[in-house]
Amino acid sequence: MKEGEKMKPYEHGGNIYDYQGNLIDFSSNINPLGPPEWIWEAIKEVDLSRYPDIKYRRLKEAIAEYVGCDRENIIVGNGAAELIHLFARAFKLKKPLIPSPSFLEYERAVKLNGGEPVYLKLEEEEGFRVNFAKVISKIEEADGLILGNPNNPTGQGIIREEIGILLKKAELMNIPVLIDEAFIEFMKDYKKYEALPLVKKHDKLFVVRAVTKFFGMPGIRLGYGIGSPSLIQKLEEYKEPWTVNAFAEAVGRWLFKDREYIEKTREYVNAEIEHMLFSLRTIDYLVAFDTKVNFILLKLKAGTVDEVKEKLLKKGILIRDASNFRYLDKRFFRVAVKRREDNMCLIEALRGLYEEGVMPDKERVVV
């Protein structure tokens, strides 16, 4: 970003506050089962008369046990977004490679640091999958790599073996790599994709995760990152103190022990993904792209998302206009996977746009 240049506002999902009435929020990719019941007991135990432990020792111990690493490998933050910005700032990234469309905060973090990312377009014809051979080639132009795995808004992932090849290339170039795994726990076969086992082999690998997405509590901002002790120490030097409040710390200490909730969520969400994809693909004016996580990218074969969003809002449904993601336009929108009854409301509302004349019937739909 050039000196004196103003940054355009970056909009995110979950912004129900701009709209009136009770809405079913399909714009925010949060666990449809909601937070575990015991969370309220954990919150009651918070002592607001004291600062949180500035080193977050007990919280880091809980995370370390969950992911299988040492406390020295962990940093915590006010959501994954804080850690993404911290990474860009600590490594002074000016031109990292960002396969796109992707989470908007990657780009924003770099531009706020005075940089301009190198972009690699994820092709619709390839299902928006990350072509790691193209990444290997394009990374020659970059001073870092920021990769969503699974990626938002496309819902696609890259397997660990391919990540390992990317890391070897990055190591030869002596550049840092951030892999954002905010949604990885929703994946049915997540162990094939997670990069955590690679942290011990690569000093400049930083893996970021978000607690609030999978555990259904975006109001409690909590994220964590895993890296080598030297990388974590470097990030801590740039980090503001006490960015994780007492509520988030208390909940986080217990969250990762609830294995039943974790498995129940993964099973429920993946069953709903299959149901939603099947149902959405019966609607002629839509293209529903494959996904491995709790959201689905959709493309209109006719019309614009503005028309669809306006009509759905009148039915009490909020979707995510995806046109502000790089390389996407007004034909694209994203919906979260929610509870069955809510998902059916969305499906029926989208089908109903035929009858209302908002969308053309199947005889007049063109790709």
UniProtKB/Swiss-Prot annotation:
GO terms for molecular function: pyridoxal phosphate binding; threonine-phosphate decarboxylase activity. GO terms for biological process: cobalamin biosynthetic process. Its cofactor is pyridoxal 5'-phosphate. Pfam families: Aminotran_1_2. It is an enzyme of class 4 (lyase). Gene3D superfamilies: Aspartate Aminotransferase, domain 1 (3.90.1150.10), Type I PLP-dependent aspartate aminotransferase-like (Major domain) (3.40.640.10). It catalyses: O-phospho-L-threonine + H(+) = (R)-1-aminopropan-2-yl phosphate + CO2. O-phospho-L-threonine binds at residues 12-13, 29, 152, 320, 334. Disulfide bonds: none annotated. CDD domains: AAT_like. It comes from the Bacteria. Signal peptide: none annotated. Pathway: Cofactor biosynthesis; adenosylcobalamin biosynthesis. Keywords: Cobalamin biosynthesis, Lyase, Pyridoxal phosphate. The keyword Lyase applies. Its EC number is 4.1.1.81. SUPFAM superfamilies: PLP-dependent transferases. The modification N6-(pyridoxal phosphate)lysine is found at residue 213. Decarboxylates L-threonine-O-3-phosphate to yield (R)-1-amino-2-propanol O-2-phosphate, the precursor for the linkage between the nucleotide loop and the corrin ring in cobalamin. Belongs to the class-II pyridoxal-phosphate-dependent aminotransferase family. This is Putative threonine-phosphate decarboxylase. It comes from Caldanaerobacter subterraneus subsp. tengcongensis (strain DSM 15242 / JCM 11007 / NBRC 100824 / MB4).
